[in-house]
Amino acid sequence: KNIYIDYLEKFKNSKINAVGLSFVQNKDLIIYLKKKFSKFLMISKIENSEGLKNADEICKFSDAIMIDRGDLSAEIGDNNLYDAILKISNLTKKYGKPLIMATENLETMSKSNNPSKNDIISLGFSSQINSDVIMLSEETATSTKWKNIIIWLNNFLISRNKKLPQQYDDRIFWETVNLVKDYTLVVFTKKGLMLDKIFKKSNTNDVFVFTDTKKTKSISNFYKNAKCFVTGKINNKNLSKYYYDNI
């Protein structure tokens, strides 16, 4: 914990908006750091046995979750990796949080102009479990083919999104803060406190978020199906007039 505090103190006045927490064991570190450094979004990496055991509470209190398949596999064994990924992804979406899939997503493209079949299947699996972000590491950090890799991945993700089925239900209702799934949603929010509940219901359909705070925009940017716009100060007392005057 002290290591994180030392580093975050140095960067608290920077333009950094999110922090990755490695080898998170339980919720305690997350809660402490979120209170002390409320400016930052806390992205927890679940990558060992203890973190996997406490994955439910880690997903609940984090702003986003990253699955580091390399470290996780080394910690729990290759044979347990698949089930662990399913568990973490299900819990992440249970709490409506963004899911980041990391490690060797397009490793073969570091030396080749095209991905392997295994790369493509892996990316398809990540899409099926509703990963919001595909994270590249060595593919772009050390490879001379980094530009080609980014272009290929961008085109692949665009084509995948176009193929995702849009489902619609004749019923739409509010029940406290829960929204019915499968509709394009427009949300006005200051602190983004409802976003996790919204994304429990909307994994594939577009969600347009309007906010007057940078932190809400930062967390919205992690969701694959969210488009966020920073507005002038939102007046909750007369939101409809604000919309027609400013949008």
Question: Predicted segment positions?
Answer:
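Non-catalytic helical/linker scaffolds that mediate oligomerization, partner binding
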Residues: 1-247
